[in-house]
A protein has these predicted regions:
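A structured beta-alpha segment of the ubiquitous adenosine-cofactor-binding alpha/beta core
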Residues: 66-85
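Beta-strand-loop-alpha-helix segment that lines the small-molecule cofactor/substrate pocket
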Residues: 87, 93-145, 160
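Glycine- and charged-residue-rich phosphate/anionic-cofactor binding loop of Rossmann-like
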Residues: 39-42, 346-367, 387
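Predominantly a Rossmann-like dinucleotide-binding segment in NAD(P)-dependent oxidoreductases
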Residues: 137, 144-238, 292, 383
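C-terminal glycine/acidic-rich active-site capping loop/insertion
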Residues: 1-2, 11, 143, 245, ...
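C-terminal capping/lid region of NAD(P)-dependent oxidoreductase domains
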Residues: 4-11, 136, 163-167, 378-390
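Glycine-rich, aromatic-lined ligand/substrate-binding cores of catalytic
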Residues: 204-291
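N-terminal Rossmann-like dinucleotide-binding module
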Residues: 1-62
Length: 390
């Protein structure tokens, strides 16, 4: 169980690019990063509007002279300080991720980036090589995989409690884009523009969360081929999609279905995962993150609760509140940030053995998410044809 004791040598000097007053995810990053005393926010380029960013930064405790106008100024000026920033979080629109990440790595800074990581696998692989050459960590904020019961599911699968995996069924939907985009805010505009969002809308924005979580739970099976059907129900969003279904064939013979939509009218936002094996099934939803349904064929269904001693150690190790109290998304983000901090600390100490065994969403996870998106787009653009996953 996590109790807030600092698990690294000292707090990391941390900065942010984006995530300011008008951003949607900045607060999630800050509360996650600062929960366990592993990061100390020392600087930021929080906003395209430099004055607004400076005003925001000072109001969250950053010195005015370390609130910069853009990421280039941040990198240049922090490099000249003995107490300069060591790790930078990137909470900006998709099209900026590659340039900012590469610049930070070239300056010797670790990076924590929003997903989807970049536009192409080629960009991901280039940056992965750069990070390896520089001896730096790149983390990706797949923020839902810090929930303790996600790791309970992975442990149950690993122990064979489900038997052979047969069916993978996942959805992440909401209805907040069910209407047209007249009067829509900037967050909607950039997400539905291929120049700023990349080749997908909901597949990249929310579908990659499903894909990565399934990789955490089912690391031993891989997609062999897939079929993607995507559609823009609001025509102005085309060629990007606001709804998509992906069918997947796995190398062990399992079948998968993934549904993502931002036009599921009336739905406030929900993720659901069901993993079916030859012996039993498990089902988990982020709407009830403290509960995991475990169904064994021929037996009464069981509801497993977070923090209980009957759970696997992998789950209990990332629990924060204990069984008496609920855990939420903020706790999950805190775990992600903690695991990345521990990885940065290990990299700094040269502890490669720790890094080999330590789970965190890194650049390989980000790369595989982009690879999945590339295959989805290739299938959809071929008339929703089956394509080999490569």
């Amino acid at each position: 169980m996590i109790n807030g004791e600092r698990s690294i040598e000292r707090p990391l000097r941390w900065g942010m690019v984006g995530g300011g007053r008008t951003g949607q995810v900045g607060y999630k990053h800050r509360t996650g990063a600062q929960r366990d005393g592993t990061y100390r926010l020392v600087c930021g380029a929080f906003d395209l509007d430099a004055e607004r960013g400076r005003d925001f930064g000072t109001k969250i405790g950053v010195a005015a002279d370390r609130c910069y106008g853009d990421f280039k100024e941040l990198i240049a000026k922090e490099a000249g300080r003995e107490d300069g920033v060591e790790v930078v979080s990137i909470a900006t629109p998709n099209f900026t991720h590659y340039e900012i990440t590469k610049a930070c790595l070239e300056a010797g800074l670790h990076v924590i980036c929003e997903k989807p990581l970049f536009f192409t696998v080629a960009e991901c692989e280039e940056v992965a090589r750069l990070a390896e050459e520089k001896g730096l960590i790149v983390g990706v904020t797949y923020g839902f995989t810090g929930h303790p019961l996600v790791h309970q599911m992975a442990a149950m699968v690993k122990k064979g409690m489900l038997g052979d995996i047969r069916i993978v069924d996942m959805q992440y939907t909401h209805g907040f884009n069910a209407g047209d985009d007249v009067g829509a805010g900037e967050a909607v505009k950039w997400r539905t523009n291929p120049k700023t969002a990349g080749p997908t809308f909901v597949l990249g924005d929310i579908g990659t969360h499903l894909y990565y979580l399934s990789e955490v739970v089912l690391p031993h099976i891989k997609i062999e081929k897939l079929l993607c059907d995507r559609k823009a129900f609001i025509p102005t969003r085309a060629p990007l999609e606001d709804h998509a279904t992906v069918l997947m064939h796995y190398d062990n013979g399992a079948r998968g279905r993934l549904w993502v939509s931002s036009v599921n009218a009336g739905n406030m936002g929900s993720q659901r995962y069901r993993f079916v094996g030859s012996k039993a099934s498990i089902e988990w939803s982020d709407s009830h993150p403290d509960q995991l349904i475990y169904e064994v064929q021929g037996e009464p269904n069981r509801t497993l609760h977070h923090g209980m001693p009957y759970l696997e150690e992998e789950s209990l190790a990332c629990d924060r509140m204990g069984a008496l109290h609920t855990e939420g998304l903020g706790d999950s983000w805190a775990n992600i940030y903690l695991w990345i901090a521990q990885s940065i600390d290990a990299k700094r100490r040269g502890d490669e053995a720790f890094l080999r065994d330590h789970h965190y969403p890194g650049i390989q996870a980000g790369t595989e998410g982009v690879r999945w998106l590339e295959n989805c787009v290739r299938s959809a653009d071929a008339g929703s044809a089956w394509v080999e996953f490569n």
